[in-house]
Amino acid sequence: HCLQITTGQVLWEKDLKAQFDAPLRLYGIGHSPLIWGDRLYVNVGGNAEQTGIVCFDKHSGNIEWSATDDAASYATPRIARIHDQDCLFVLTHQHAVALNPHDGIEWWRIPLSIRIVDAENAVSPLVYQDIVAFASYGNGTVCSRILPGGMKEELW
């Protein structure tokens, strides 16, 4: 639901399970969205094609773009401006993903699948200057330097 902050009036709503075939994860649907400008980014994890990450217009609820076929995590997406370019970082259930937040074009991904039963990725990407780190449950941590154009150089 998108609510008017002072009155609580419902402005628009989406049934993520119905619209995107988003499965109930281990702890149910518990997305932690990100608002940036006029957009709302959600790690939906839908089973419908290319509905892993969905960007909505925050005013209308209209879909701006959708990308990846990854299942959802409980991590909040993160946007950072690096080398004069906006970068969207998302930890999904299977990958660390970097995308262009304006059009959803995927720049790169790093495998970080859960290797333990009854576990979920939940740590939001950490950004410091031009470095981004992703931590997964049971599959370690990766750290990369973001290069101009959105590409990466793995540090560790």
What is each PLM-predicted segment?
Residues 1-156:
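Noncatalytic, solvent-exposed loop/strand surfaces
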